[in-house]
Amino acid sequence: MASEGPREPESEGIKLSADVKPFVPRFAGLNVAWLESSEACVFPSSAATYYPFVQEPPVTEQKIYTEDMAFGASTFPPQYLSSEITLHPYAYSPYTLDSTQNVYSVPGSQYLYNQPSCYRGFQTVKHRNENTCPLPQEMKALFKKKTYDEKKTYDQQKFDSERADGTISSEIKSARGSHHLSIYAENSLKSDGYHKRTDRKSRIIAKNVSTSKPEFEFTTLDFPELQGAENNMSEIQKQPKWGPVHSVSTDISLLREVVKPAAVLSKGEIVVKNNPNESVTANAATNSPSCTRELSWTPMGYVVRQTLSTELSAAPKNVTSMINLKTIASSADPKNVSIPSSEALSSDPSYNKEKHIIHPTQKSKASQGSDLEQNEASRKNKKKKEKSTSKYEVLTVQEPPRIEDAEEFPNLAVASERRDRIETPKFQSKQQPQDNFKNNVKKSQLPVQLDLGGMLTALEKKQHSQHAKQSSKPVVVSVGAVPVLSKECASGERGRRMSQMKTPHNPLDSSAPLMKKGKQREIPKAKKPTSLKKIILKERQERKQRLQENAVSPAFTSDDTQDGESGGDDQFPEQAELSGPEGMDELISTPSVEDKSEEPPGTELQRDTEASHLAPNHTTFPKIHSRRFRDYCSQMLSKEVDACVTDLLKELVRFQDRMYQKDPVKAKTKRRLVLGLREVLKHLKLKKLKCVIISPNCEKIQSKGGLDDTLHTIIDYACEQNIPFVFALNRKALGRSLNKAVPVSVVGIFSYDGAQDQFHKMVELTVAARQAYKTMLENVQQELVGEPRPQAPPSLPTQGPSCPAEDGPPALKEKEEPHYIEIWKKHLEAYSGCTLELEESLEASTSQMMNLNL
């Protein structure tokens, strides 16, 4: 160290402005690895001359003073050993070694830190002896500039102090056996140590000191320029010495600190006070024995003891320091003190950044230590930097969302990687937290780069792989209570079922049928054929085989004659049953002209003409029935009946569709019509039908349980329940009248309310048609009875049904009759009374309707 240049007169003093506020840093100290060792750290008494002296008022609490201890004492009394006065091996305390020229005590600059609202646990420290010294012009200007900069860069200094402490502490570590002297010299116009440590511009950063001596001592002889200034400092008294316990072979870090809060003291530092009467002069720093203070570690804590060092003080050989004073730079010893001019003369805020740079000579000297210590120091330095940057990274850095389903969407992962490659990282060293913050702010404004085409292709591939084994047509899921319709359904049924979807099923209505729920296929599976359908298909196959075998025309003629005979056998019992009891009176009242009037029905013209020509043609075989007019029919076909049936069915269908649109559930419960052989037979057994309409051209299936047997069963149930049954319209025409695209064989009517006129007219026309059919049969029978014997065999089946009533010829008994013909004969006698009652009721109802119309 070197002395300053010319001084100003002592009368000139500078007082601090009231605007200047003290700043107490949160953490003060250098990170020095203190080793727990029983060896004492010898602190030479000559170093006391370079400490500013501040005295504390007496306190009530017990503290350890050096005068209370005997020289060479190794332990403290147990009552003084507490958690507040023991030193933790890692509790660091900064010290400053200043020359006497840098010590200025300004009146009125004492700050009280014992305010409970601001700093709890701080002790009140006042200067008992306020010493004023003249300041040079450079120091005045420097101080004014510093006070202005401190107010302006308050927050910046706080941040820099935290970072600088971490970097400096790592720089001053060296190999084992070497010593580092950290000298912090700042303007002593600031009376408190915390405010001094915040002033980064005037701080003196110590460089590496490599020495092999176990004891570090220095005197004023090494710095002759300082001896003259010591004469002016006779009034200044000793200050308490602060020092962390350290082994002899490790580093020594000395920093000046005037005030230390009790909270920091409790962490492991010990307060050592000297007698205020003690004083150290320049003569004490000579080769004579000097008084040193030692801090030694004991199981009870750290112990301070004063000893007399007999060794000669050795000047430090390698001391590199940074002094922020221009006048000292020239007079310092170049071998002992290395002062970079760029750092010593810097007073702008950039000086804080320059302090972080390690001097080249310092690097070369520090490299002489062991590599192990340097690795430790570098590792700790990295940890410090990571701690300082982690505060910002936690707040600002946010990871982008990860795409975990990389297997399902591989293109998304590729797009994200491509985007990460484009964005190159900037300022990876110190400005990385700030850049991360900026990137996060601007991330929402950047256009999102996603490969939508790749996403769509990936989804399509996944769907194709899933549905590869399934059918190409999708499955429709009906969420509600109404089933979903297929596109192929008819227009009328589609309208009705779509109306069902508007109104949900009422679960409280127990009479309502249950609606289908769940899944339904657009194209339903092929239903298994019923027993009736199986019989029909079987007979069709047999007929085809028979036609293939008998391809000759005589075979066809024989088949036709057999069909005609069987048709006559089937029809005449029915005709006898229906026309005998019901239409006898009408046959008498209506002559055979009605038979002529029904000759020209449009669709049945051929069979009607054949029936009309049977009377005059006595020589030919009487053929009444055909494929369009089956033998189960018991009435003559006419256009009037067909038109009346068509009007009735259309009206009932209109009523039913209107009800479905208003209330589908109610329309389902109160239906007007039912279609099909099986459904009609089912409701006939339940006695819910009021009328049955049968198509006259149903297919001929004579097997047991076949179509003919089912039709006869339906007619039988209708006769039992006195229900009128009408033969009208062929199958296709009957389906068209019901707005169906398929042919319909049988239709059952539940209720004809609203269409009574059409219904009664249909019944009247049906009764007349039966009478005409009965008259035709009587005429045919009379003609066949008067026929000679050769014509008897072909007429036997036609005369069979009427023989029981008229004592027919004995040839009838020789002919075998089918089983169902015998059943019809029995029904003829049993149902004669029922048919009469039905006829009377129909006549009464028609007469009432006529009276109402009048």
UniProtKB/Swiss-Prot annotation:
PANTHER family to which the protein is assigned, alphabetical: GH01354P (PTHR13284), SELENOCYSTEINE INSERTION SEQUENCE-BINDING PROTEIN 2 (PTHR13284:SF9)
Residue spans of biased composition, Acidic residues class: 560-572
Biased composition (Basic and acidic residues): 536-547, 593-611
Role noted for this protein: mRNA-binding protein that binds to the SECIS (selenocysteine insertion sequence) element present in the 3'-UTR of mRNAs encoding selenoproteins and facilitates the incorporation of the rare amino acid selenocysteine. Insertion of selenocysteine at UGA codons is mediated by SECISBP2 and EEFSEC: SECISBP2 (1) specifically binds the SECIS sequence once the 80S ribosome encounters an in-frame UGA codon and (2) contacts the RPS27A/eS31 of the 40S ribosome before ribosome stalling.
Noted disease: Thyroid hormone metabolism, abnormal, 1: A disorder associated with a reduction in type II iodothyronine deiodinase activity.
Keyword terms, alphabetized: Disease variant, Mitochondrion, Nucleus, Protein biosynthesis, RNA-binding, Transit peptide
Region annotated RNA-binding, chain positions: 673-694
Stated name of the protein: Selenocysteine insertion sequence-binding protein 2
Pfam families, A to Z: Ribosomal_L7Ae (PF01248)
Gene Ontology CC terms, in alphabetical order: mitochondrion; nucleoplasm; ribonucleoprotein complex
GO MF, one annotated term: ribonucleoprotein complex binding
Listed Polar residues bias regions: 338-350, 361-372, 426-445, 548-559
Gene from which the chain derives: SECISBP2
Tissue expr: Expressed at high levels in testis.
Disulfide cross-links: none
NAD listed as a keyword: no
Placement of sequence motif Nuclear localization signal: 380-387
